[in-house]
């Protein structure tokens, strides 16, 4: 896979951001430090920042210099999991019982990398909306952002997200139209009948 020299050049900075987020994981709707980091980075690149959607969500808007056009959303999640990290590298979690075990630190850093690149290359029509979602892990953060008017304020023509996938070879991308990954849901059933032994159900 061919990477632009500018992307390679910015990789250490984006890696530092990822490690910073990894070392300070925050659970759903508690992503205040992460949201501050995201907002500060976007602002420093001249991207307009909107806070408060979905409680701790952050949205950045970048308008192209070639006039009106499509509005494209790029989305990443920011929350960590309630797990104890047992790694011993320098950027291991400093928050007991919290860990970025699903790669949202990477997702957030990658989207910031895309934002940084596009902020330096505004020769496009339309707008890019950078959506940093809280509470993906069982907190319905996307629903909360939508309830707070995300797509009324930013009527995107399309929204793209990604998830890291260690099973794919480095440099490969898996793409599909529509939903791709299953969600975990709970439900209850009631069975009416007589009790008995499993070996003698009759």
Please tell me what each predicted stretch does.
Residues 1-100, 109-112, 116-124:
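Acidic/His- and Gly-rich active-site-bordering loop/insert found
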Residues 81-83, 87-99, 106, 124-202:
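Histidine/acidic-residue-rich, glycine-tolerant segments that coordinate divalent metal ions
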């Amino acid at each position: 896979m061919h990477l632009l020299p500018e992307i390679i050049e910015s990789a250490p900075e984006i890696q530092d951001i990822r490690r910073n987020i990894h070392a300070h994981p925050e659970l759903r709707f508690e992503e205040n430090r992460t949201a501050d980091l995201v907002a500060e980075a976007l602002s420093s690149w001249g991207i307009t920042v909107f806070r408060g959607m979905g409680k701790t969500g952050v949205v950045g808007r970048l308008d192209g210099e070639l006039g009106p056009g499509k509005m494209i959303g790029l989305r990443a999640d920011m929350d960590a999991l309630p797990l104890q990290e047992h790694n011993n590298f320098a950027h291991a979690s400093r928050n007991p019982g919290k860990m970025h075990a699903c790669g949202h630190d990477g997702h957030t850093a990658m989207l910031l990398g895309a934002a940084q690149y596009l902020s330096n290359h505004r020769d496009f029509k339309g707008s890019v909306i950078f959506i940093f979602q809280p509470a993906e892990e069982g907190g319905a953060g996307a629903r909360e952002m939508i309830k707070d008017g995300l797509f009324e304020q930013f009527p995107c023509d399309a929204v793209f997200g990604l998830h890291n996938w260690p099973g794919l070879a480095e440099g490969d991308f898996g793409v599909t139209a529509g939903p791709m990954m299953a969600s975990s849901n709970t439900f209850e059933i009631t069975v009416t009948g007589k009790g008995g032994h499993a070996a003698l159900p009759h």
